């Protein structure tokens, strides 16, 4: 996020007509001294994925699966790729909310998981400390930035994604908060954590209680969002066919729909 570009070049990189995002990124002018200016730059994160694939011959998803996802018990992960088959890196990873929580717990535990040291504590500390100042209207986006991690108030750090996806780690409170949502008010979500959850935390660990633990598990198992009923007589078959899109920044050309009885 401090590549030296004066503004985020991601849209230009991702919309390059030939789909060669690496070449488009490397052709950009670098107006500032690298490391001197924070500019949020998803294309730079994509370049990290491209470099890893060049060196290992594996996509970022394939590289992480045996080293991170499998040990954490994360299954079914998918990652979007660019037109040249490189994992997009800065976006497009699909995992469950509880998998996000596992990732945060791994960092909270300084890289240790079920007796394995998946990441070094030194790397955890280095990646999550502030390396550069950032400036933003929203308070939670001007606390500094590490290696792909935002610094937060209350000596916390987080990874986040568009429209309210969060992995927030509070080492001093021994707490991880994982959220998947659809909202434009991401600062409001963060404010809710600080104003509601944080004051409710006890100063020390609760005594172990098998009964209360079982009650908690039962409560968690009962939580679900109800599925909306299907509309009868909707006749979805009328939408079957192939649809061609106009030229767009996402490089999407067409979509096809078919329905089975």
Write out the residue ranges for each language-model feature.
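Flexible glycine/proline-enriched surface loops and loop-helix/loop-strand junctions
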Residues: 28-34, 44-46, 82-89, 152-156
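Active-site Gly/Thr loop motif
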Residues: 124-177
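Peripheral terminal and inter-domain segments
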Residues: 207-261
């Amino acid at each position: 996020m401090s590549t030296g570009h004066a503004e985020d070049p991601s849209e230009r990189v991702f919309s390059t007509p030939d789909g060669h995002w690496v070449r488009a990124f490397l052709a950009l002018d670098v107006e500032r001294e690298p490391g001197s200016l924070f500019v949020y730059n998803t294309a730079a994160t994509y370049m990290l994925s491209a470099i890893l694939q060049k060196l290992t011959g594996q996509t970022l998803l394939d590289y992480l699966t045996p080293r991170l996802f499998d040990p954490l018990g994360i299954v079914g992960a998918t990652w979007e790729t660019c037109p040249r088959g490189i994992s997009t890196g800065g976006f497009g990873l699909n995992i469950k909310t509880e998998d996000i929580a596992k990732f945060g717990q791994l960092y909270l535990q300084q890289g240790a998981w079920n007796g394995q040291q998946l990441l070094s504590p030194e790397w955890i500390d280095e990646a999550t400390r502030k390396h550069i100042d950032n400036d933003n209207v929203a308070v939670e986006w001007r606390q500094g930035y590490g290696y792909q991690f935002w610094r937060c108030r209350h000596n916390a750090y987080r990874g986040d994604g568009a429209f309210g996806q969060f992995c927030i780690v509070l080492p001093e409170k021994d707490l991880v908060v994982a959220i998947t949502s659809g909202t434009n008010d991401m600062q409001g979500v963060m404010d809710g954590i600080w104003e509601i959850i944080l004051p409710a935390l006890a100063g020390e660990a609760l005594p172990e209680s098998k009964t209360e633990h079982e009650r908690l598990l039962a409560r968690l198992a009962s939580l679900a969002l109800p599925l909306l009923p299907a509309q009868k007589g909707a006749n979805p078959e009328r939408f079957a066919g192939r649809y061609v899109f106009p030229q767009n920044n996402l490089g999407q050309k067409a979509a096809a729909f078919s329905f089975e009885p």
